[in-house]
A protein has these predicted regions:
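N-terminal auxiliary segments of SAM/dcSAM-dependent transferases
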Residues: 1-24, 34-35, 39
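Glycine-rich phosphate-binding "P-loop"
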Residues: 126-138
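Class I S-adenosyl-L-methionine
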Residues: 3-15, 167-197
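A short glycine-rich, Lys/Arg-flanked "PGG" loop and its adjoining helix->strand segment in the class I
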Residues: 141-153
Length: 197
């Protein structure tokens, strides 16, 4: 079976490269590597998510679920220096890169963690994710069913999914689970959703 970016320990040879994250009012240079999601450029879905979601809360606990090398976490931490940003992934190489990028950028408010390293009592004032749709529907649904209930009552999740990789069916599934889902934007085949209680 081919190795994927959601493998816990990528075996593919390392070949790090710098990629640029270009957003209105924010330019970040991030180190990426083979064996992690979108290792040669910031994924267009991630860009759509960051461009179309509102500014994050200025304080509280924020979650980047499936953080990869950290473009979402680093953007959130830069925009909300008073918040704690949890960068969570199962991929060890991704976590090393996310930690390195946060440190290099002086973002001391980023906490890089495996899923089981996040205290169970932690509740989130916002969740952002370009979720790993290629992991399969069942695993994706389990992932979201685990983390979405950890949102505080007044907070939202912001997610992006490619229309051609099940973005609309993901929104329908979330609605069927009792979540209020609003399509905030549709850009170049990517759906940006707000998910709330």
């Amino acid at each position: 079976m081919a190795e994927h970016y959601f493998s816990s320990a990528p075996a593919v040879a390392s070949d790090p490269a710098l990629v640029g994250l270009h957003l209105p009012g924010l330019e970040l240079s991030l180190l990426a590597d083979r064996g992690v999601f979108s290792s040669r450029r910031v994924d267009p879905g991630t860009l759509a998510l960051l461009r179309e979601s509102p500014a994050p809360p200025v304080a509280g606990q924020l979650l980047d679920l499936g953080c990869g090398y950290g473009p979402i976490a680093c953007a959130l931490a830069t925009r909300s220096p008073g918040a704690t940003v949890w960068a969570v992934d199962v991929n060890s190489r991704a976590l090393e890169l996310a930690a390195s990028n946060a440190e290099r950028l002086g973002l001391h408010n980023v906490r890089v963690a495996l899923p089981d390293e996040v205290p169970e009592t932690t509740r989130f004032d916002g969740l952002w994710s370009n979720p790993p749709v290629r992991v399969g529907k069942e695993a994706l649904h389990d992932l979201l069913a685990t983390w979405l209930p950890r949102l505080t009552d007044a907070s939202s999740a912001w997610m992006v999914a490619n229309k051609h990789l099940g973005g609309d069916s993901l929104a329908a599934w979330l609605t069927g689970q009792g979540w209020a889902v609003r399509r905030a934007a549709s850009k170049s085949g990517y759906r940006v959703f707000q998910v709330a209680r």
